[in-house]
């Protein structure tokens, strides 16, 4: 992990098109601004983890549905 020190109003770049600016600090919180390309999605970590978990659960459900449909089709072809 790269660790950097920045003051309010200072920025850093990730590549050529992502700028992160420190806007201010209040107690234990740091307010940051992100300038990112319009086609890039940005999530807070807790939201990202929830989305990933829901996607995983949806995939498991989809697999179960597919297996059930396959079994029904298989049973009908035996008749």
Curated annotation (Swiss-Prot):
Lineage top rank: taxon: Bacteria
InterPro entries named in the record: CsrA (IPR003751), CsrA_sf (IPR036107)
The gene coding this protein: csrA
Subcellular location(s) per record: Cytoplasm
Gene Ontology cellular component terms for the protein in this record: cytosol
Pfam family, any one: CsrA
Natural source organism: Nitratidesulfovibrio vulgaris (strain DSM 19637 / Miyazaki F)
Function: A translational regulator that binds mRNA to regulate translation initiation and/or mRNA stability. Usually binds in the 5'-UTR at or near the Shine-Dalgarno sequence preventing ribosome-binding, thus repressing translation. Its main target seems to be the major flagellin gene, while its function is anatagonized by FliW.
Keywords of the record: Bacterial flagellum biogenesis, Cytoplasm, Repressor, RNA-binding, Translation regulation
GO biological process entries: bacterial-type flagellum organization; mRNA catabolic process; negative regulation of translational initiation; regulation of bacterial-type flagellum assembly; regulation of carbohydrate metabolic process
GO MF term list: mRNA 5'-UTR binding
Main location: cytoplasm
Subunit structure: Homodimer; the beta-strands of each monomer intercalate to form a hydrophobic core, while the alpha-helices form wings that extend away from the core.
PANTHER family, alphabetized: CARBON STORAGE REGULATOR
Stated name of the protein: Translational regulator CsrA
Family designation: Belongs to the CsrA/RsmA family.
């Amino acid at each position: 992990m790269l660790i950097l020190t920045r003051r309010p109003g200072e920025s850093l770049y990730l590549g050529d098109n992502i700028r992160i600016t420190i806007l201010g600090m209040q107690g234990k919180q740091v307010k940051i601004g992100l300038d990112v390309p319009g086609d890039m999605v940005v999530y807070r970590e807790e939201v990202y983890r929830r989305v990933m978990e829901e996607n995983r659960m949806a995939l498991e459900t989809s697999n179960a549905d597919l297996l059930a449909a396959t079994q029904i089709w298989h049973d009908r072809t035996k008749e």
